Curated annotation (Swiss-Prot):
The lineage of its organism: Bacteria, Pseudomonadati, Thermodesulfobacteriota, Desulfovibrionia, Desulfovibrionales. InterPro entries: Ribosomal_bS16 (IPR000307), Ribosomal_bS16_dom_sf (IPR023803). The keyword Ribosomal protein applies. GO terms for cellular component: cytoplasm; small ribosomal subunit. Belongs to the bacterial ribosomal protein bS16 family. This is Small ribosomal subunit protein bS16. The gene is rpsP. It comes from Nitratidesulfovibrio vulgaris (strain DSM 19637 / Miyazaki F). Keywords: Ribonucleoprotein, Ribosomal protein. GO terms for biological process: translation. Pfam families: Ribosomal_S16. PANTHER family: 30S RIBOSOMAL PROTEIN S16, SMALL RIBOSOMAL SUBUNIT PROTEIN BS16M. It comes from the Bacteria. One of its GO terms (molecular function) is structural constituent of ribosome.
Length: 79
């Protein structure tokens, strides 16, 4: 089982926000995650990002692979 750190879409039509989750790579986009790691709300200005870095680091140490978008959000959060 390979694990991905990816975005799961939440919210209403045209008012989306995203949860950052650790999920089995074969699972569907909004399927049951292994763990919630944070959220990303692009609808507010500036975009709101909150990530639990300890949980993310735990998954990265276990070999989880972030998607490109999550990788970008992690870089913004770190610096």
């Amino acid at each position: 089982m390979s694990v991905k750190l990816r975005l799961a879409r939440m919210g209403n039509k045209k008012r989306a926000f995203y949860r950052i989750v650790a999920v089995n790579s074969a699972a569907r986009r909004d399927g049951r995650p292994l763990e919630f790691l944070g959220f990303y709300n692009p609808m507010v200005n500036p975009a709101e990002v909150k990530i639990d870095t300890a949980k993310v680091q735990k998954w990265l140490d276990q070999g989880a692979e972030p998607t490109d978008t999550v990788r970008t959000l992690l870089k913004k959060q770190a610096g």
